[in-house]
Amino acid sequence: MKPLSHTQLSTFTKRFDNFKDAELRSVEIISPLTIKLTLATQDSTRAYDWITVSLEFNGVQDARLLEESQLSYVDMSQGASLIYDENLFAFGISECYNISSIKNSSLYLIAESLKYEEGQF
């Protein structure tokens, strides 16, 4: 896993087109304060080939998670938001601009730090 800083977020989300039409693969609770979210998404740096991206949220402050069986039903046509607000990293389904709008998402995570890993589709 590579650390992702708040200054890299814009480039990172642009690279994956804000996860539009991505597929949520899994949500893994590693510990009460660490949660890993895995998505299949298209990578603009690889001619839009599909890859797997895992996001590991550490120091989780708040979250709304779904059962594994529900992940395939999440509408990702508008993508997801990955933002840095109030000194926290936040991920939420759809277009969100701050933590309070993220909390309206069907799935969201708010944490102190973020790491990522790329893998095969």
Enumerate the predicted regions with their spans:
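Surface-exposed, interaction-prone regions used to assemble/regulate multi-protein complexes
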Residues: M1-F121
